[in-house]
């Protein structure tokens, strides 16, 4: 079938490092389509795309994903965000197989209001700078 792309986002830190080669994140109730979960049943390959706009960096990451359910309560607890007001439905754990830092040449810097407020005035460009209202940096999964 066609390749599939699903945006996943959350507050900074929602993607957790479990060990040197493993990442994971909690999955909460959403649009009830379960497309990613269904796709992973037939093909566990995953590509993630992380953007760091203020530092003009992007990371492509390839790996194999597995779904974690209530039978692995300890893993779910590690990936849960205690401040997020929802129940964890499942988690995704990704075994990283490869990654690549891309060239920053065509990345337009963007800042959250919090990041912009923390910069010295001399560091803020005089031209319009895109400002993201939320403090979330979101990977595509």
Residue ranges and their predicted role:
Residues 2-141:
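Binding-site signature for planar aromatic cofactors or substrates
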């Amino acid at each position: 079938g066609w390749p599939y792309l699903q945006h996943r986002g959350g507050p900074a830190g929602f993607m957790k490092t479990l060990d040197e080669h493993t990442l994971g994140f909690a999955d909460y109730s959403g649009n009830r389509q379960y497309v990613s979960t269904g796709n992973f049943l037939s093909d566990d390959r995953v590509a993630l795309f992380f953007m760091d706009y203020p530092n003009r960096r992007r990371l492509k990451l390839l790996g194999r994903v597995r779904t974690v359910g209530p039978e692995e309560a300890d893993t779910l607890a590690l990936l849960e965000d205690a401040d997020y007001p929802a129940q964890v439905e499942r988690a995704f754990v990704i075994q990283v197989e490869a990654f690549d830092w891309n060239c920053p040449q065509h990345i337009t810097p963007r800042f959250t209001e919090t990041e912009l407020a923390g910069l010295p005035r001399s560091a803020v460009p005089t031209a319009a700078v895109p400002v993201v209202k939320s403090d979330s940096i979101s990977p595509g999964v």
